[in-house]
C-alpha cells in the first residue's frame, strides 16, 4: 500500500468526459475511468479546483469569460493603453524619435515620392517657412518642439506628413492645390505641428505594439488571427484620436498667429474639388476607388492628411467652422 498526502499530488486539469488522472512525485500515476465517482470522491476529500477550471466546465462560465475578455480589451484600448503609451513615449529620449523619423523619411522618399527634387522655388519654400515660423513665434515658450520643413515632388498628390523627430514633409501638390495661399499652408503645417507636439508618431508605434502584445496574451491560441485584427482596429481608433488632437493644436496655433481657423475649411474645399474633378463623369463617390478618393489618395492612406482613419471630412469642417466663430 502506498500513501501520499493530497497536497503532494499533481492534479491535471480535468475535462467533462475524459478519465481522471493523478501524478505522484516519484513518477507514478493513477487513472480512473469512472469520472463521476472520482469527482464525488474529490469533493468529499475537500479538493478544490481553480476557478478557471470550474468556468471551463460550464457554457455559462465560458460565455461570461468571453464577455469579460471583450470588455477588458475595450477598456484597455479606450483608456489603459493610450495612457500607458503616452507615458512610455514621453519617457523615451528624443533621439529615439529622431532615429525613427530618419528611417521613416527614407521609406517615404522611396515609396511615396518622386526621384526628382521639389519644383517649388527656394524663395517660395522660404516664404512658407517664414510665415509658419511667425505663427509659431506667438506661442508660449517651450510649446514648439524642434522642426524642419522639407518639400517633395510626390506620387500621392496633395499631402503633408509629420514624422517623429520633427521633420514635416509637404508635397508640391499641396502648395499647388491652394495656389500658395500662405494662411492655408500655415494651417496645414499647424496641424502637423500638433502631431509633433503630442509625439503622435512615437505614441502610435508604442500603442500598436502594446495592443498587439496584450491581445496576444489575452486571446491565447487565437492570437494569430484575432490579435492582429485587434491591433489594426486599435490603430485606427488611436489615429482618429490623434487627428482630433492635432486639429485642436492647429486651432491654437492659428489663433495665436492671428489666422482664422477657416483656412482649414478652404483646404477641405479644395480637396473636395480635386476629388470631384478626378472622378469619371457620372460616377458616384462610393464607386470611385475607396470612399470616392482617387488612386493617389489610396497610396497615402497610411500617412498624412489623407489618412484613411482620419475623422470624416464633414466632422472636421464643422470643427474648424465653429472654431472660426470663436466657439
What are the residue ranges of the model-derived segments?
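Short acidic-glycine loop/turn motifs at beta-strand connectors
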Residues: 1, 25-26, 164-165
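Phosphoinositide-dependent membrane-docking surfaces
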Residues: 3-14
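Well-ordered beta-strand positions
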Residues: 10, 23, 161-162
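A Zn2+-metalloprotease active-site environment signal
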Residues: 44-287, 296-326
Amino acid at each position: 500500500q502506498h500513501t501520499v498526502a493530497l497536497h503532494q499530488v499533481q492534479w491535471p486539469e480535468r475535462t467533462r468526459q475524459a478519465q481522471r488522472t493523478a501524478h505522484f512525485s516519484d513518477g507514478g500515476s493513477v487513472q480512473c475511468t469512472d469520472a463521476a465517482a472520482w469527482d464525488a470522491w474529490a469533493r468529499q476529500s475537500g479538493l478544490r479546483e481553480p476557478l478557471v477550471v470550474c468556468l471551463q466546465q460550464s457554457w455559462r462560465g465560458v460565455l461570461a469569460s468571453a464577455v469579460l475578455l471583450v470588455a477588458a480589451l475595450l477598456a484597455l484600448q479606450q483608456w489603459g493603453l493610450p495612457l500607458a503609451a503616452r507615458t512610455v513615449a514621453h519617457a523615451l529620449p528624443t533621439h529615439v524619435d529622431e532615429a525613427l523619423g530618419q528611417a521613416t523619411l527614407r521609406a517615404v522618399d522611396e515609396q511615396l515620392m518622386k526621384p526628382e527634387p521639389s519644383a517649388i522655388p527656394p524663395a517660395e519654400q522660404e516664404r512658407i517657412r517664414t510665415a509658419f515660423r511667425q505663427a509659431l513665434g506667438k506661442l508660449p515658450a517651450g510649446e514648439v518642439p524642434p522642426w524642419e520643413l522639407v518639400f517633395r515632388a510626390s506620387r500621392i498628390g496633395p499631402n503633408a506628413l509629420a514624422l517623429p523627430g520633427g521633420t514635416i514633409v509637404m508635397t508640391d501638390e499641396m502648395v499647388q492645390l491652394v495656389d500658395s495661399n500662405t494662411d492655408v499652408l500655415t494651417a496645414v503645417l499647424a496641424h502637423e505641428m500638433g502631431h509633433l507636439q503630442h509625439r503622435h508618431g512615437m505614441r502610435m508605434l508604442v500603442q500598436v505594439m502594446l495592443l498587439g502584445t496584450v491581445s496576444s496574451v489575452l486571446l491565447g491560441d487565437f492570437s494569430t488571427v484575432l490579435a492582429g485584427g485587434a491591433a489594426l482596429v486599435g490603430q485606427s481608433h488611436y489615429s482618429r484620436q490623434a487627428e482630433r488632437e492635432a486639429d485642436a493644436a492647429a486651432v491654437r496655433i492659428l489663433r495665436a498667429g492671428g489666422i482664422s481657423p477657416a483656412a482649414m475649411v478652404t483646404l477641405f474645399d479644395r480637396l473636395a474639388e480635386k476629388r470631384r474633378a478626378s472622378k469619371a463623369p457620372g460616377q458616384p463617390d462610393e464607386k470611385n476607388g475607396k470612399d470616392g478618393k482617387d488612386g493617389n489618395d489610396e497610396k497615402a492612406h497610411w500617412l498624412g492628411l489623407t489618412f484613411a482613419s482620419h475623422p470624416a471630412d464633414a466632422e472636421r469642417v464643422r470643427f474648424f467652422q465653429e472654431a472660426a466663430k470663436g466657439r
